């Protein structure tokens, strides 16, 4: 008799997908992206300068970040290193418009990423309870052909979203003090602003970088 796995595979290959099937599938992905989107924030990099007439001016750069951890006193946000590189001060803006000061917690010049912290005392109890932490996934489980979701700023705007597939996986890429795992995807992306890659369970499995574009 034919193995059950072969029967299932054959049936799936012969199944004719309809527009309704496609809408249902993307509806599920949209739900995942919407839920994770609650943990996406805007990170404002503020520089204090003076104009030609010695008048103080403020310039602001905007980046995307994701809330990756929360303790009793602070929340930690992963964001591109560029967001903190020349910042005199940092502001974190939540999806509901709440603005709180941030401070540099850690930076990784190899990965070009940084962690910004905010004090939970700057939020109300209700706001603290509503903080949505993005769950960390296992990037080593990513396989070629996997569907992925991009959140953060893939379209160059914070809180934009895109969907795509993993095109290729490089399991061992030499990096400073270790080996990195890199995968390529066809999702729209903006590495400078901050684009974060999720699996279909809504878990963070990576972020977009342009370091390996020519390799």
Please annotate each region the language model reported.
Residues 86-104, 143-148, 159-172, 181:
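Beta-strand/loop subdomains of soluble extracytoplasmic proteins
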Residues 2-70, 76-77, 89, 143:
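N-terminal activation segment of mature serine protease catalytic domains
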Residues 40-42, 75-80, 141-154, 194-214:
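Active-site-proximal beta-strands of protease catalytic cores
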Residues 120-134, 162-214:
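Active-site region of chymotrypsin-like
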Residues 70-112, 120-121:
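Catalytic-histidine neighborhood of serine endopeptidases
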Residues 48-49, 60, 70-72, 85-86, ...:
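Short, conserved beta-turn/loop elements at beta-strand boundaries and strand-helix junctions
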Residues 31, 67, 103-105, 123-157, ...:
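Active-site substrate-binding loop(s) of clan PA
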Residues 60-62, 86, 189-193:
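Short, small/polar residue-rich loop motifs at catalytic or cofactor-binding pockets
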């Amino acid at each position: 008799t034919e193995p059950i796995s072969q029967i299932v595979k054959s049936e799936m290959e012969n199944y004719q997908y309809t527009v309704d099937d496609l809408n249902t599938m993307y509806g599920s992905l949209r739900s995942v992206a919407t839920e994770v989107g609650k943990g996406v924030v805007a990170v404002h990099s503020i520089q204090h300068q003076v104009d030609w007439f010695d008048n103080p001016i403020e310039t602001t750069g905007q980046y995307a970040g994701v809330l990756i951890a929360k303790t009793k006193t602070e929340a930690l946000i992963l964001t591109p290193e560029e967001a903190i590189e020349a910042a005199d001060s940092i502001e974190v803006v939540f999806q509901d418009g709440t603005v709180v000061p941030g401070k540099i917690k850690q930076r990784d010049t190899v990965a070009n990423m940084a962690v910004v912290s905010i004090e939970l005392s700057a939020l109300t109890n209700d706001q603290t309870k509503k903080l949505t932490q993005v769950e960390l996934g296992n990037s080593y489980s990513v396989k070629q052909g996997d569907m992925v979701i991009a959140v953060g700023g893939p379209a160059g705007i914070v809180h934009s979203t895109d969907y795509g597939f993993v095109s290729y996986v490089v399991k061992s890429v030499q990096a400073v003090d270790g080996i990195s795992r890199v995968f390529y995807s066809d999702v729209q992306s903006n590495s400078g602003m901050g684009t974060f890659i999720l699996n279909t369970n809504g878990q963070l499995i990576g972020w977009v970088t342009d370091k390996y574009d020519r390799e």
